[in-house]
Design a protein with these regions (language model features):
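Flavin (primarily FAD) cofactor-binding/catalytic cores of flavoenzymes
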Residues: 1-346
Length: 346
């Protein structure tokens, strides 16, 4: 950004984007962006790079947990020393959940990890990062599309990020390595009754599914390399998730009995489009758009907008083409309005 001399305002949240219904396509100013600091930025075009991971998600059952137990979202977690004494329950086995559970265990805390369905990918494989392989072999699109019959909340649900957790940027981190460190794996949290949580008895099943997802992505990469004649160093041993020492926990977890004083909700984030003009959103509060890029209002573009069946919007590396498309559209708008003879082909 410094090289291109972009005017960047750091630590400046946007309070609201205003686009009056009377705004005309020919207006020089179509958007007024109100900043939390009190300033206003006027523009003809607007790129809303709000993404889909803006607002912490905490399940409703959290309100049914005994109030003596401290609760926080992973966004607010800082370090083990900042937590009350006692054992800790981490809910959610995504990247944050596994890394937090690992750090707590390393610091000598008794840790329980309530698992959920996820895919486990290695951070690196055969000389490349997993994100490079996902880009080369189009793995960003290999995710399930929400059932279109269930709108509303399902439309806001993002495709799950594969777990590529590592410890200190080096060793792989997964359910197998956590269990080996003494982290107690418990089933998915389903309900709460005071100090007792109701669980799905599914630890072994989820661990097997995670191990299978790892084998499948490695096989996809290996097969793709062979078919396309690409050269990449072999990796031995290949990454794996050990499940032989993982067992089901049972249908309930008594927080008091296990001296659990803190629950950390590593249950992800959801989108928050409240700053955008109301007429840019549908009845569910979701942007009206085309292909996750073109907004319903002329001059409004989106970057990183979740499209429901792909991880591409969640990865900066996969948004390069979207960024180029948006830049071309704004360039064309500028050239055609200025009467310049500059080329439109950029």
């Amino acid at each position: 950004m410094a090289r291109r001399k972009l005017r960047v305002r750091q630590h400046t949240p946007v309070r609201e984007v205003e686009c009056p219904a009377t705004a005309h396509d020919g207006d020089e100013v179509r958007f007024r962006t109100h900043l939390a600091t009190g300033g206003v930025v006027e523009s003809r075009n607007l790129v809303a790079a709000v993404g889909g991971y803006a607002k912490p998600r905490v399940p409703a059952l959290a309100s049914d947990v005994d109030p003596v137990v401290a609760q926080l979202h992973s966004r607010d977690y800082r370090n083990p020393e900042s937590l009350p004494d006692g054992a800790v329950l981490v809910v959610g086995a995504g990247i944050s959940g596994q890394q937090i559970a690992d750090e707590l265990a390393e610091r000598g805390r008794r840790v329980f990890l309530s698992v959920g369905r996820h895919r486990t990918y290695p951070r690196h494989y055969r000389g490349r990062t997993i994100h490079e392989w996902m880009y080369v072999f189009s793995l960003y699109d290999d995710f399930v599309t929400p059932d279109p019959r269930h709108l509303g909340e399902d439309r806001r649900r993002l495709p799950g990020l594969p777990v590529t957790a590592v410890k200190d940027g080096a060793g792989e981190l997964n359910l197998g390595t956590l269990a080996e460190k003494g982290v107690t794996l418990v089933g998915s949290t389903r309900a709460a009754r005071g100090h007792v949580l109701e669980l799905a008895d599914n630890v072994e099943e989820i661990a097997r599914d995670a191990a299978r997802s790892l084998r499948e992505v490695l096989d996809t990469i290996d097969t793709g390399l062979r078919r396309r004649g690409f050269v990449a160093p072999e990796q031995h041993p290949a990454p794996t998730v050990r499940t032989d020492h993982i067992t089901d926990f049972g249908p309930t977890l008594d927080l008091a009995r296990h001296h659990i004083g803190t629950i950390i909700w590593c249950t992800g984030f959801g989108p928050d489009y409240a700053i955008l003009p109301g007429r840019a959103l549908d009845e569910h509060g979701v942007p009206i758009q085309q292909k996750g890029i073109l907004g319903s209002i002329p001059g409004l573009y989106y970057a990183g907008l979740p499209d429901g069946n792909s991880l591409a919007p969640a990865a900066i590396s996969a948004n390069v083409e979207n960024g180029r498309f948006i830049a071309r559209q704004i360039h064309i708008d500028h050239i055609m309005r200025s009467g310049s003879s500059a080329s439109l082909m950029v």
